[in-house]
């Protein structure tokens, strides 16, 4: 629908705007992505979608629009699934031995450097920094899930 409205609007532009070049581009969704849009309009970016835009439109006011609500709300189950997924991707952890209550050092045979790498991977996954004092206490996946749920205010 939006493409029909845009094409109808562009076709009604005065002849002075006719020689403006049209450019094919791809809209890519990114965390906190920004996109040019008309004033007061919000644009929802999906997967790679071609968009036809005018290279220059004199007199149009544009602003940056941010998408803050793109992610679904966190749940305890969702946090647990993401934590276990990140841990299963870690090459030093045997996925068959991994459970929510597996101790990193006692059950999985990891050392303190591996534990630091796991915490860094969790920071990347969830988008916030875990202080070293708190990171030293996180020795199993369930403790990580509880910590993230506490920091992100997730309660069920």
Curated annotation (Swiss-Prot):
It comes from the Eukaryota. One of its GO terms (biological process) is iron-sulfur cluster assembly. One of its GO terms (cellular component) is mitochondrion. Gene3D superfamilies: ACP-like. Pfam families: PP-binding (PF00550). The modification O-(pantetheine 4'-phosphoryl)serine is found at residue 112. The keyword Plastid does not apply. Residues 77-152 form the Carrier domain. Keywords: Acetylation, Electron transport, Fatty acid biosynthesis, Fatty acid metabolism, Lipid biosynthesis, Lipid metabolism, Mitochondrion, Phosphopantetheine, Phosphoprotein, Respiratory chain, Transit peptide, Transport. Phosphopantetheinylation at Ser-112 is essential for interactions with LYR motif-containing proteins. It is found in: Mitochondrion. The modification N6-acetyllysine is found at residue 88. One of its GO terms (molecular function) is structural molecule activity. Residues 1-68 form a transit peptide. InterPro entries: ACP, ACP-like_sf, PP-bd_ACP, Ppantetheine_attach_site. Mammalian complex I is composed of 45 different subunits. Interacts with ETFRF1. Identified in a complex composed of MALSU1, MIEF1 upstream open reading frame protein and NDUFAB1; within the trimeric complex, MIEF1 upstream open reading frame protein functions as a bridging scaffold that interacts with MALSU1 on one side, and with NDUFAB1 on the other side. The complex interacts with the mitochondrial large ribosomal subunit. Interacts with alpha-1-microglobulin chain; this interaction is required for the maintenance of mitochondrial redox homeostasis. Carrier of the growing fatty acid chain in fatty acid biosynthesis. Accessory and non-catalytic subunit of the mitochondrial membrane respiratory chain NADH dehydrogenase (Complex I), which functions in the transfer of electrons from NADH to the respiratory chain. Accessory protein, of the core iron-sulfur cluster (ISC) assembly complex, that regulates, in association with LYRM4, the stability and the cysteine desulfurase activity of NFS1 and participates in the [2Fe-2S] clusters assembly on the scaffolding protein ISCU. Belongs to the acyl carrier protein (ACP) family. In contrast to other accessory subunits of complex I, NDUFAB1 is the only subunit that is essential for cell viability in HEK293T cells. Since knockout cells lack assembled complex I and die in galactose media, this suggests that the essential role of NDUFAB1 is independent of complex I. This is Acyl carrier protein, mitochondrial.
């Amino acid at each position: 629908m939006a493409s029909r409205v845009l094409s109808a609007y562009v076709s009604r532009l005065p002849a002075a705007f006719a020689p403006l070049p049209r450019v094919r581009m791809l809209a890519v969704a990114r965390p906190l992505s920004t996109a040019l849009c008309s004033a007061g309009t919000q644009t929802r970016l999906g997967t790679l979608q071609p968009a036809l835009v005018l290279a220059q439109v004199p007199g149009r006011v544009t602003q940056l629009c941010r998408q803050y609500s793109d992610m679904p709300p966190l749940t305890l189950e969702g946090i647990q699934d993401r934590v276990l997924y990140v841990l299963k991707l870690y090459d030093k952890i045997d996925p068959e031995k991994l459970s929510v209550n597996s101790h990193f050092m006692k059950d999985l045979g990891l050392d303190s450097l591996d534990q630091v790498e796991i915490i860094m991977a969790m920071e990347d996954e969830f988008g916030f920094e875990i202080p070293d004092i708190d990171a030293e206490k996180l020795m199993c996946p369930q403790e990580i899930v509880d910590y993230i749920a506490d920091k992100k205010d997730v309660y069920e």
